[in-house]
Amino acid sequence: CDMESKAKPFCYKAQVIETSRLCAKQLELKEDEWGISFQSRIGPGWIQPFTDKELVRLAKEGIKNLDVVCPAFVTDNLETLEEMNIRGRETFLEAGGNSFNYIPCLNDEESWVDFLVNASKR
């Protein structure tokens, strides 16, 4: 599913697409300045495009500098720290990229914690 519907109100892929779109809009990125991929694949049926393949493709297409954020996660974990910040970085740089800037998750950012506290009081 590429968008939420009554039949699939909690579609992970649709939520990731919408969250990413909203982040790109807030950052005033043009359509060709951002993209989406999916990591931590479990078998061949996982959601595509696969992050490792996209990192190679981007480097081969001449993208030299990459900023990476994982908006599906609110805290860093093995998937973000090891898969993205370590292996993803290595994959991109080995494929020809020059810089890989991993942007950490919200983690314990004060404004995020304040939001959670206020939301839990409702």
Where are these regions (language model features)?
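Extended amphipathic ligand-handling, pore-lining, and cofactor/metal-binding catalytic surfaces
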Residues: 1-122
